[in-house]
Amino acid sequence: MPTNDLSQQQYHKMTETPIPRLILSLAAPTILSMLITSIYNLADTFFVGQLSTSASGAVGIVSSLMAIIQALGFMFGHGAGGIISRSLGNQDTHAATKFASTSFFTAMAVGAVLAVGGLATLPRFMMLLGSTDTILPHASAYARPILFAAPLMMSSLVMNNILRYEGKASFAMIGLVTGGVLNIVLDPLFIFVFKMGTGGAGLATALSQCISFCILLSMFLRGKTVSQFRITEITRAPRDYLLIFTNGAPSFGRQGLNSIGGMLLNIAAREYGDAAVAGMSIISRIFLFILSVAIGVGQGLQPVAAFNYGAKKYRRVRQAAIFTIFAAFCFVCVLNVVCWCNSETLIHLFRDDPEVLAVALPAFRYQCLAMFLQPVIVVTNMMFQSIGKSGRATLLACCRQGICFIPLILTLPHLLGLPGIEMCQPIADTLTFVISVPFLLPFLHKLNRMEEA
């Protein structure tokens, strides 16, 4: 029977609607949001790439900074979001407001600490993230406005996740899409019209994120949400902070390893000059676009898997996982084939430099081959996360950019030189796939047996 936090209508929708229609309808807003985010990341790469190879390399350096902000923001957002969702299910609005307030204001405070520390040590910070001496001025100019905006960016991630956990994903999408579109508009204006260079790209990102923050905050101030933000509701109990951290640890680990992996990639690439840093940065941004589609489809699976697993409709969980892998594979195949056929054109689009092309093209084609494995990797991880198998989910989440990637990026460049850097991510993806399959297949068989029992 449905629990008291779900209406009968929602129960029938989640347990009776045909799986393909249900998953695609739930995935559509997430795919749109993630595509917009990927597009404005590509826009940054495109516009900055018109300046110089060193400026293009700065995008990769600042990507690691953005990953740090996201790791902390997702930790507080996902950490509090699950608690808020369960509290509202128990009709405990006071607890929801307490955890919403605590996560929001704590994220803002942590963002302020990051901003002050980062600005005070900016050149050393950028070198730590993998900058070269020639990239450093561009990376510093790019990062400075983003660091100023870090408190708002981090708390925006908290608000975005609270809205999703309250079931108001469309409100979250409005803030995200508005910020993304504004970023695309402001980039050429600040970079070329106002001649601000990479600093203009950073300012465009910072301003668009501030607007997104205001839109998201307005949802809470206008009473569109159940949970509210009140300074007086910030908890003083260490146990509550530990609960937020424990719930948010998988997200923190995943995003944190993305940052560390990106930093190590930049450090390895800088031994071969600015063109290598720029080339690997361009590849990362292009394939993040393709990966965002697989992740978006996978996020359509999460509520379906969680609901039906809780309702003991295990065969629907199995059907949902298989369909999601198939749907994500179809989307990835189309995008991958288009990218493979236009590989040189795409790289030239972001930086028309023969040295950049020489580095990026082999890496591009290696990554194309490995992208076909992503649907299995993404769906396996998300399915386990959604049904509460947090140990397996955390292990798999840490594989791609952590357990598999970090040892490779520390060893292959010494053994193979530049080709070792170009091969690291595809090999890490292949290893993650090999690790994921033994988790996925037995569990799908187990779901059938559980249904029959």
Q: What are these regions, as identified by a protein language model?
A:
Residues 14-46, 50-51, 67-79, 83, ...:
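N-terminal transmembrane alpha-helices
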Residues 77, 146-164, 172-180, 201-214, ...:
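Short runs within selected transmembrane alpha-helices of multi-pass transporters and secretion channels
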Residues 25-44, 145, 179, 208-212, ...:
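Transmembrane helical elements of multi-pass membrane transporters/channels
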Residues 68-71, 183-188, 213-217, 289-292, ...:
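Hydrophobic transmembrane alpha-helices of multi-pass small-molecule transporters
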Residues 1-27, 84-151, 193-249, 305-370, ...:
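Short alpha-helical transmembrane segments in multi-pass integral membrane proteins
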Residues 35, 39-57, 126-133, 189-196, ...:
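Helix-terminus/linker motif at the lipid-water interface of multi-pass membrane proteins
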Residues 47-67, 134-138, 198-201, 240-247, ...:
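Interfacial/gating helices of multi-pass transporter permease domains
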Residues 56-116, 153-172, 279-343, 374-396:
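Small-residue-rich hydrophobic transmembrane alpha-helices
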